[in-house]
Structures are given as structure tokens and as C-alpha cells.
Amino acid sequence: MDSHLLSFLAAKTDPQNAGLWLPLWIHSRDTAEVMRRLAIHWLSNGARAALGLEEALLSKLAYFLGAVHDIGKAIVLFQCNITQHLPEVRERLARQCVFPERFVFPRATPHAKASEAILLQLGCPKGVASIAGAHHGKPQENGQNEYIEENIESYHNNYYGKGEKDLWFSLWKQMLEQHLRDAGFASVEDLPVLTIPQELLLTGLLIMADWIASNTNFFPLLSVEDLGSASLYPKRIADGWERIHLPEPWQPLSYLPMDSGSFEDRFGFPPNEVQQAVLDVAATMEAPGLLILEAQMGVGKTEAALAAAETFAAKWGAGGLFFGLPTQATANGIFGRLTAWAQTQSEDTAHSIRLAHGMAELNEDYRELFPGRSFVETPEEGVSVHPWFQGNKQALLADFVIGTVDQLLMTALKQKHLMLRHLGVAGKVVVVDEIHACDPYMITYLDRALSWLGCYHVPVLLLSATLPAQRRAELVAAYLGAKTVDRKLFSNRGYPLLTWTSGTTVQQRVVALSAGQRQVALQTAREDALPQLLEEALAEGGCAGIIVNTVKKAQAIANLLQEKMPEYQVVLFHAQFLMPDRAEKERILLERLGKRSTPEQRDRLIVVGTQVLEQSLDIDFDFLITELCPMDLLLQRIGREHRHPGHDPYRPPRLRQARCVVLTAEDGFDEGSKAVYGEWLLWRTQMLLPSAVHLPEDIPSLVQDTYSWEEQDVIPQTEESELALQLYQLKEKSKRENAGQFLILPPKKRTVLAGPAALDDWMRDERARSESQARAAVRDGDPSIEVLVMMKCRDGSVRFLPWQEGGAAVPTDRPPSLEESRAIARQRLRLPGYFSRRWAIDAVIGELEEQNRCFLGQWQQAPMLEGELVLLLDEEFSAHLAGSRIVYDRERGLTYGKEEACERDGI
């Protein structure tokens, strides 16, 4: 064999410039050096602890994996393909080896699979080889009649052509021996046997290293005449590393557990009893674990979690924070608070921050953090959006990530590049707020994600107003990787309640509160009594909130009140508004009902809304009316009433005693409510409604009795209730089973019953191929259709709605600019579920696509608008879609109805 063959092998080319290439040996070394630097300088201590490898072994193994990951490019098939447009390189290779005239099964040997097959053939451990095979984001799969290591023999023409087996085998052996020596291993026998969790994290690190080393801005290509030289190193690596300038892991400024003094320094106020209890528990925990905080609404759970996160990070070397919330709106709402906190974490070191959800780039607060195009210079202290972490796949790799809980749930979903998500969470503190908002489908993914976080020894904080005892037990069992947890332990009805793990044991603490109980009087009423109830309650002034379970009902009630009570301002708030309109309504509500609102701002204001009012909006009503819903959510809604004690002296006399009216139907339950929550929970909640709620004392008993986990049920059962329970349980089971089809395996389970653990076959039948598909996969329900709403005028022009962007026209004969695209993308709205039902969805999408092809074909060429559906309204802000008439109103949001009904009713 000519010793020059190794120097002639190609790894990278430039599709636009046939005069550039990168030799395989250089890309291998670039990736090896980058991976070693990532392992030693970028990984946090917590992530290294999750890997469970001594630093010296980790350094050697990281280098080796980076060096060998593309050994599968050293096959005749790959070299034949890549040199088709590199005549000089091809000519050099042709003097060393023979290219077959054709390949019968070229798709049978992708180069990642070839890498794994070659490493197995040369005696590498299966786990190590499977990492190389998975470096494109998905582990290799064994065929029905062929194992991966047999791929060489089965498709030998792809590997070494005809008659040159010895040549290529000798080359592979030479490459492997060189990489072993450079890494510091004497032979393949020195390579470790790894576990599945270790392999996942190392694969994530390898993917990251490969992407960085493949970026020509960091590691440029060479002229085709240049074979490269060892003299390029170490400068080539130092220059590339400086160009990317990854932020260093978070190192909290408080190196000791946070006390009350440092808490006050951080947040500007001393800790209350609940916050102090969290600080105490965090300080005494001897190992990373799970901490569940159940406490009343408005008690400051966010600050308690951030303080505990600092303590955990300081104790166990976590390099960042993930803070998950139920919706994009709640994530946007808390982003400013968490950014301000993150700024306090930086002294001399810059950190990266990421708002992680589908519409993050449209959040102006987030966009203000975007750095300039150049990021070579030494950054100033603070937090910014590091360019490398802007991709969807890299979302969880930033130091501080604020996003929807979906981002965490996707760590349990079979999805390409899943390993990057695991790498992102393994070195962080994880906080999930409003954990009660997860439905049974999402719970399945959450529990599996928790099992992996427990395996990685990630500190986790879960926040909720309250949890059913069974759910609390399931969360702990998932984190500990246990099948069950002592049932008696979770019958604790103390409140506020802390539950945490200490190794494999579980402890609890009830927080003693010095402040008095807050009493809320409850009464029931029919919907038709609403105007009279409000007239009486607001006779002396004040504000009221009405929370119902469906958008249609909210719109109907708002219409009724505007007609019957014209002297009051009625504000409608739900999810079917354009993003800018909803954001403006949120701003107005926070201004008029927030902590700093004045009596004048609050007076004679009635807000009608859906569940979005119960989620993280820090507003305070003087009087509350709510439609019947499950007890835990009912209490969450009650938490929006008399929330801020600072308003108490100014409330009208008849509203100084908190009072909540629960709307019930005359006969059975409202159909919309049954569709959302199920009949069994509504029935139990109605049966258990007291005449008054004492907060926070009554919260745990009401919730536990409603969910009926304990053996002694407080409600006598009837034949009707038993049937409702069976239907509820069947629905829950069905949701969990549907979710379970696409779950990754638990940490300790292998894909094969015997042999060393390896990633092979680990992600068969992955559910999602795109980010949007992944987000949909971890949420239950019918598929939803999101549209961008614009207006098509009689003169043929397409414009923003008059109150958006000044009603400006947008050209349709060219792709919109980036700024135009961003403004158009903000006009987003989710169509009501009716339009995504099985019998309607194809027709709806077909109509929208045809309309877009006719009028907006050029818009699909704009990257931000590619694949988007645009709903064009006429100058009356209406449109006809799939036999329905849609109308958009700035105050009411989107309404719809069958065309014949709309004509009859004058809509």
C-alpha cells in the first residue's frame, strides 16, 4: 500500500467551489481536538459527573471518538462519490486504488454505518462503535438478516471494490492504530465498555464537535493542491476555538448555600416562610435529587426555585438552568424576570441564554439580546444569545434556557439528534413550573424525562399549587427509577408541602405559616344570572374576572355583558387572538390589574377569559366568577382573586371579603367542559364544593378528595359515577398508551437481552423529523392549524390589518425581506379545533394552500415564511373557509360559523 493514500482521502468539499476540499485526516483531527476541548473546557462539572468517567479517561476517549467518527469515509464508495467534482483529488486517488464502474446497493452503506462496521471489525467495543454509527443523530439499526458488523461482507463492493480488500483493511487498521496512539490508548482492549446513558451523552458531544469542526467559518477548507500538514497544528485548533468562543459553564457567585441575606441581595426582599424552607432543604440535601414544592398561588415559588438552583449549582457543579413553563405565553411572560436574574449570575464571564419555543424569535425582549454578526472578540460580562445555540437542535445547550415544557418532554421522544437534548439537560438544574398543567399524555413523556434526569443526577425542582397524591408519588418514582413508592408517605395533607429525595429515600416537610388564613366564600349560580350577579357585586366599583372553559363561551358571555352592562368596560382574553393583539391585551391587563394598579385603573373593569387567565398572569380581581372545572384548576383560578394584599385597603366595601361564584349547568355538565375535562372530575368537584375555602389550609384536602387516591372515599359512589370513573380511566390509559408508542427506553433497559450495551436499534420508528412535529408529538389532541392573518384588499394588494404595522402593504411579487417576514410571522393565530377535525383538516389545508399558491407564491421563498399558511381576510376582516365564515375582530378575536347560519344571523 502506498503510504500517501491516507493523505489523499477526502472528507469535505465546497459545492460552490471545486477548488476547495478538506482531507479526511485533517477533519478527523479537527473533530478530535474540538471534542477534547468540549469535554474538558466546556462541559460543566455536573455534566462530567453524569458521564461518570475520570477526567483523564474522558479526555482520551473524547479525542478518540472525534478521530474515528468518520473512518467510514475511508471506503471506495464514499471517495468515489465525493471526488466526482474534484478531478485533481480523484486523479491522485486513482493512482492508489481502483474505483468500481458502478455500485449495486450504494444506499446500504451510509458512511456513519460504515464507521461502526469498520470499528467493530477491528475489535472496538460495541458501545464505542455505536457512538460513531450514531453521529448523524440516529443510531444504526440491525437488518432482519444482517447485523451491522456484517455490512462489510454483505456489501464489500462499497467498501473496497474488487480485489483490493487487503489494501483497504490495511488502511483502516493503520488509521485506527494512529488514532489510538494520538488519544493515549495502547490498543482497543484499553477502550472502556460504556453504558447507554454514557453513550448518549458522548454521542451528543460528538455531534456537537462534528458540527463545529465542519463549519468552514471556524475550520476553513484547503486548496485542492494542498494535502495539509501537521504544521497546521495546534494553531488551526486555537484559531477555530477562538472564533466560536463558546461561553464557559455557569459558576454561581454564591459558593455556599444561599441564606436569607444573600436571598435579599439577589431579589430585593427577604424570603418568606416558604422560600426560607426551600433554602433550608436545598442547603441540607447531600446529593442531587428531586424537590417538589407545593405552595399557594402568589407565594413566590419562582424566586424560591431560582435561589435553590443557585445552591444546587454551587454544590454539584451544574453549568446552567432550564426553566420550563406550560405555554409560550407563560414563557414569554417570565422571560424578563429570568433574564434579569441571569444577568446577576455573570461577573467576569459571558453566558448564553435561550428562549426555547416555536415563536421565540418574534419575542422582542429576546431579540434585544441578539449579538452582532461578529463574535470573535472577548465578550463583555452578561448574557446574550450565542449564535451557535440559535438552532432548534442546540436549544438546550445554552447556559440559561427559558422555554415551554415541551423542550424537556422532547428529551423522552424518539427524535433525531435526541442526544443533543440529553447533553443539554445533563449538566443543568431543571425547574418546571405549573406541573399540574400537564395532561396524561404529556405526563407520560415527563415521567420518562424525569427517569433520565435521575439517571444523570440532575437536580430537579417541580413547582405547583398542589398535586394529587398519586401524581406526586409517580413523579418521585419516575425520578428514582422505581416502580412504586411507599403509598403511605404520600398521604400527607400538610400544606405548603416540600417533598424531596435523598439518595433513594424520600422526605417531606410541611411549612408552618405565621400569616393568617385567607377565606374565600363560594356560591353556585346559573349562567343566565351573570349580569345581575355582576351588577350587585360591582355596585360600589371594583373589577371582576370571569373564567370559562371554551373560547366560544367566553365570546358569548362578553357579547351578553357588553349589551346588558354598557357602562362597564368588558375585556375579552383568550388564545384565539393574533400574537400582537394578545400581547397588547396582556400588557393592558397587567397594567390595570397587576401589583401596581390603582383603584382608578381597576374600577368598573370586567375581564372575560379562558384558561389562559389561570396561567402565570400576575393579576388580581376583586370578584371572581368561574365555570366549574376540576378542583385543582378551580383553586388555581381562585388564586387570581385578592392576590395582592396591597390592594386590600382600596377594595370596595362589599368586595373586601373574597367571594367566588361557580357557574353550574341546570342539567348535567356543559358539553364544552366535558370535552375538555371529562365528566368524572367535574362531578367530584361539584360534589365537594364547600361554602367557603380557607387558603392555603384547605387546598390539599380538597384536591386529594377530588382525585380519590386514598382507599376511604369521602363521596358515596353511584352507578352513574362508577361509569364516569371507568370512562375517565379508559381515556387516561388510552392517552398514556398513545404517548408510549414513541417513548425512548428507560435508562436501564437495553434493546437486546444479551451482550454489551450499545445504541444500535435504540431509536427505531422515531416519531418526529422536524421541530414542529416534535412539539406536536409531545402534546395530545387533534393536529392544530396555525395561520398568518393578512388582508387582501379590493385593489389586489395584500396588507397588514389596519392596526398592525400601520396597515402597510407587503409586495407579493418578491419574497418579503427579513424584517417584513418577521412582521408577517407575528400575525399568527391558531384556528379553532373545528378546522382541524379529521373530516375537515384536509379541505382546510388544501384551500389555504391553493389560495397561497395563487396570490402569495413568492412568500414561500422567504426562509421565515416557508411552509406557512396565510389566511387572507377581506376588507370586512372576514373569509370563507371550508364551508364556514371566519371573522376576526380586534376585541373579540376570531369567530366562525357555518355560512348559512352566519347569513341567517347577520354575521
Where do the PLM segments sit?
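Accessory nucleic-acid engagement/destabilization modules that flank
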Residues: 2-253
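Conserved pre-motif I regulatory segment
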Residues: 257-294
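Walker A/P-loop
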Residues: 287-309, 438, 464
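A substrate-engagement module of RecA-like helicase motors
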Residues: 338-399, 405-409
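Conserved interdomain linker/interface between the two RecA-like ATPase lobes of SF2 helicase motors
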Residues: 483-554
